[in-house]
Amino acid sequence: MAAVLEPAIIVEMSRTPDITVAAVTETDGRFLVVEERINRRLVFNQPAGHVERGETLLAAVVREVREETAWGFNPQALVGVYLWRNPSSGRSTMRFAFTGTVADHDAQQPLDRGIVCTHWLSRQDLVEREQRLRSPLVLKCIEDYLGGTRRPLETVGDLDLQTAHTVSAVAV
């Protein structure tokens, strides 16, 4: 019997999705999260943020964790890649979620603008605060992590910027 293919899901996007990274890091059943102020509202999120121009995905997640939590982050695996459309703003985000360990906390380092504080919360703690999660991606990443989803870091490749510049110049 032939396999039945499901119809393709069409994602309507007003523009190119924002490329973001997030860190899922667990210690003793608790996850490192930030409490941040977004549009005058306090919400919970993984340490996460946009990839800056010229930055690799791995460099971006290491930087974001340091800036938002004052912890050093050592990525160990890719948990998943998630495309999400915010129904309120219409903006789309493609999130690359990595798992890894943290070390070298710098208690003297000020946290990134907008970050109120950091917490170590269990999955249940986050479920109980579901209305205060920045997006559904927060729990989805944790659930995938707890379900054992891991991909090698080599799954995510970066094209050398000099090579990319040469190739794009030839392609034009």
What is each stretch, according to the model?
Residues 142-172:
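Charged phosphate-binding loop/patch that engages nucleotide di/tri-phosphates or the phosphate backbone
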Residues 51-74, 84-137, 164, 169-172:
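Unchanged
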Residues 11, 79-87:
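Short, solvent-exposed loop/turn elements at beta->coil junctions and helix N-caps
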Residues 1-15, 168-172:
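Short, low-complexity, intrinsically disordered N-terminal peptides in bacterial proteins
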Residues 16, 23, 43, 118-119:
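A residue-level structural signature of the nucleotidyltransferase/glycosyltransferase Rossmann-like core
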Residues 27-67:
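Conserved Nudix-box catalytic region and its N-terminal flanking loop in Nudix hydrolases
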